[in-house]
Amino acid sequence: MDPNTVSSFQVDCFLWHVRKRVADQELGDAPFLDRLRRDQKSLKGRGSTLGLNIETATRVGKQIVERILKEESDEALKMTMASAPASRYLTDMTIEEMSRDWFMLMPKQKVAGPLCIRMDQAVMDKSIILKANFSVIFDRLETLILLRAFTEEGAIVGEISPLPSLPGHTNEDVKNAIGVLIGGLEWNDNTVRVSKTLQRFAWRSSNENGGPPLTPKQKRKMARTIRSEVRRNKMVD
């Protein structure tokens, strides 16, 4: 096993412990608490994959961080913080929408790389919008926290979430997963649209005038491609 993989996991465990203490003292905002819950699932998955105990890893991670802090000067810390790119957390969904339980009459699930796609194939002839909470860096989607598909009535009928056992995904991974979800929902004559925020940062427009990321012709072509992909890769339980 790569020692860097182990040390990275150990440090992540300790940093999660620190963030949990912050949350316990009611010092974390909604995005902070949201990431805390998601990262907990991710760490459990990584620990299972690596065969490492989280409690032991947390203690070792603390030692690693303490050693680094002893060697770190205040000036070096300032320089590091100044040079690091800052990411932003964007929210289409409220905490209630993110944490709400939902049920499927005809559940279908597909794993696409590091992302899990779930949808209810019993939903037909509905107008659906995709909303997501995610982080952005350099004006591009960096990390998807959670994406959900909502009907006009507010019912949840689909979801894309990162797999805890496979941390890390790219902007292309997210776009591909969205394409599969849209294709699956449109197969039952649903009308699907993507929120403006998600569309802006997942599909960056190359037009300087700020036009839409896809022309109507491009959208029709993408829809045909998606449907073809769905036929080849039917979503399985």
UniProtKB/Swiss-Prot annotation:
Which InterPro entries did the record assign?
NS1 (IPR004208), NS1A (IPR000256), NS1A_effect_dom-like_sf (IPR038064), uS15_NS1_RNA-bd_sf (IPR009068)
Place the motif Nuclear localization signal on the sequence.
34-38
Q: Which GO terms describe its molecular function?
A: protein serine/threonine kinase inhibitor activity; RNA binding
Entry's free-text remark on domains? The dsRNA-binding region is required for suppression of RNA silencing.
Q: Which domain of life is it from?
A: Viruses
Assembly and oligomerization: Homodimer. Interacts with host TRIM25 (via coiled coil); this interaction specifically inhibits TRIM25 multimerization and TRIM25-mediated RIGI CARD ubiquitination. Interacts with human EIF2AK2/PKR, CPSF4, IVNS1ABP and PABPN1.
Lineage of producing organism = Viruses, Riboviria, Orthornavirae, Negarnaviricota, Polyploviricotina
Q: What is this protein called?
A: Non-structural protein 1
What are the start and end residues of every segment in region (CPSF4-binding)?
Answer: 180-215
Q: What's the name of its gene?
A: NS
